[in-house]
Design a protein with these regions (language model features):
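C-terminal segment of classical bacterial N-terminal signal peptides
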Residues: 16-25
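A residue-level marker of the well-folded mature domains of exported/periplasmic proteins
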Residues: 3-6, 26-320
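Bacterial N-terminal signal peptides that target proteins for export
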Residues: 1-12, 21
Length: 320
């Protein structure tokens, strides 16, 4: 994680869009809305593009995307507290650990309009959640595994935050989807969004668990770290890899056939639709808020046949 925060591409994008880990709000009369992520990752580049598009349609607002200095509950909470102090009118957050952040999130919700994304916190006073159904995404991962491994096998999963709702729901969804099949998800290893640790978890598993025939990367960077560890060990193609999200390494693996397929989310839409939803809500228009406060943006499976078209569309959304 620390190395990714220093990543030049993320920093450059942050400077270009006015994104940072600080909570400085622009000194003008426009209300500010903030999109707060759970840690530095290329996964959020699409969300940056979504915020940028929404900004073009919301000239009466300042829109910002904020990266915490580290993927930590305390650091993320401090960032949101600083944003509230600076006068931000609405915050959309991917909480690092919703289960242990109820009090902190409720504090923010009492001071500004709070929305969640990516990993919901339904036990809080958030207005609404906009993002994926992580259970459904997990079930799609199971479909990938069953198609790639008709004779069955043992899968080992890797994820950033074991305690986060999005991780728990994806894992449970995959287990549900594998029920009755010959495939078992035997364990999931966490890394606290530490890139070096993520790769080492895979390397250690290759030594300690030679009977594993499938690896699942539940967070956006996990599949690239799986790919790199398998490549370095000369085992690409001998272990089935099930991916999540659309890191370039993951999409490259799908194209070459070393990643069976990947379940992709739509963070661009979370940010684009989410910022517009917050703006409407602050103007008194609550028509976009469903009764249960859940706005689900569907996930989809990207395989070898459609990876090129998907990658081209992703680049277009990001303005590349």
């Amino acid at each position: 994680m620390k190395s990714m925060i220093r990543n030049a591409s993320v920093a450059a994008a942050a400077l270009a869009l006015g994104l940072s880990a600080s909570a400085t709000v622009r000194a003008d009369d426009k209300p500010t809305l903030a999109f707060v992520v759970n840690g530095a990752s290329d996964f959020w580049k699409a969300a940056e593009a979504g915020v940028k598009k929404a900004q073009g349609e919301l000239p009466d607002y300042n829109l910002e995307l904020k990266y915490p200095e580290q993927s930590s509950v305390a650091i993320q909470q401090r960032l949101m507290d600083d944003l509230v102090t600076a006068g931000v009118k609405g915050i959309m957050v991917s909480a690092v650990d919703p289960k242990t952040s109820t009090d902190g999130l409720n504090k923010i919700a009492s001071e500004t309009a709070l929305f969640t994304t990516d990993s919901d916190a339904p036990q809080t006073k958030r207005v609404a959640y906009i993002g994926s159904s992580n259970v459904d995404a997990g079930k799609q991962a199971a479909e990938i595994a069953k198609k790639a491994m008709p004779d069955g096998g043992k899968c080992l999963g890797f994820v950033g935050l074991l305690g986060a709702d999005n991780a728990k729901e994806r894992i449970q969804g995959m287990k549900d989807g594998l029920a009755g099949s010959k495939i078992e998800l035997v364990d999931v290893r966490g890394d606290d969004i530490d890139q070096a640790r993520a790769k080492k978890n895979v390397e250690d598993a290759l030594v300690a668990s030679p009977d594993i025939t499938c690896m699942v990367g539940f967070y956006s960077y996990n599949t690239p770290r799986i790919y790199e560890a398998l490549r370095d060990a000369g085992k690409l193609g001998s272990i089935t890899v099930v991916g999540f999200d659309d890191d370039p390494i993951t999409l490259g693996g799908v194209k070459e056939g070393t990643v069976a397929a990947t379940v992709v989310q739509q963070p661009f839409e979370w940010a684009y639709q989410g910022m517009k939803l917050m703006a409407s809500y602050l103007k008194g228009d609550k028509s976009g808020i469903p009764e249960k406060g859940l706005i689900i943006i569907p996930t989809k499976i990207i395989g070898k046949d459609d990876v090129d078209a998907y990658a081209a569309n992703l680049k277009a959304m990001q303005g590349k």
